[in-house]
Amino acid sequence: ANLRAIHSELKTAREKAPQGVLGFNIMVATKEYASYVKEAVKAGADIIISGAGLPVSLPELVEGAKTKIAPIVSTAKSAMVICKMWDRKYKRIPDLLVIEGPLAGGHLGFSREDLSRYGADTKDVPHTYHQDLYDEEIRGIMKVVKQFEEKYQKHIPVAIAGGIYTREDVEHAMELGADAVQV
């Protein structure tokens, strides 16, 4: 049923936004990850964004298709692991990199200790969050991106997700080097 839904949902989205870039956010942690990715490609998805684990096999699953791929990372270490692995094994880099910070919802790549260190584990996050600490992590991720951009002579767009509520939040993300935000 889920595989059939991929086709019908994409068709509905194309009818509503024929010029839009349409894709799926597919969690690595799902039991049928490879099947979902392959079906999304078959359905004509423009992009697959993938997290809830490192999407190490994503390039292989979309090989030969026009579908773009975007891993979700939360640390410079995870960005380096995925970029190095894709470079070594598939001779490619992400078409887009999504950075999900500790304020993003969903399946985050943070331990409870990390969330506590960033002040993102309280009932009063707007007053306890240490943005400057996570900004340093984002800068580290951007250095990884730059390294692979230089190697491939190709820009890797970066979208920052989590904690984006206001115009000032968007401007701050852009100051950190993001090309886009995900809300």
Language-model segment annotations:
Residues A1-F148, Y152:
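Active-site entrance/lid segments in N-terminal catalytic domains of soluble metabolic enzymes
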Residues P157-Y165:
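Glycine-rich beta-strand-to-loop/alpha-helix junction loops that act as flexible
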Residues G53-L54, Y165-T166, Q182:
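Short, glycine/acidic-rich beta->alpha junctions
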Residues G106-H107, R167-D169:
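Short acidic/glycine-rich loop or secondary-structure boundary segments that cap or lie
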Residues T67, I156, A178:
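Short glycine/serine/threonine/alanine-rich loop segments
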Residues V98, A159-I160, Q182:
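Structured core elements
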Residues E171-V183:
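A compact, surface-exposed functional segment
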Residues A104, Y165, E175:
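Core active-site phosphate/anionic-ligand binding loop and the adjoining beta-turn-alpha structural block
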